[in-house]
Amino acid sequence: MITESERGEALERLIALRSSIEKRIADLEQLEQVSEDEEETARIYDARIYLIIAFENIVLGIKELLG
């Protein structure tokens, strides 16, 4: 069973990770807009999609921790 302290620590880490991923998604969006190479743009898009999926999973984890 997870203690309240452990839950709080996990929540703090998830929130920090969420913020970091949000920034990376924004960075990739900017790169995607200025990229002139189609292959590079496709790789950037794919990376952004993977980060969005990770972000959604983190949000679900936060919701689960909050009950």
Where are these regions (language model features)?
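Short, charge/polar-rich alpha-helical segments
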Residues: 1-22
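Short, charge-rich amphipathic interface segments used for partner binding and complex assembly
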Residues: 16-67
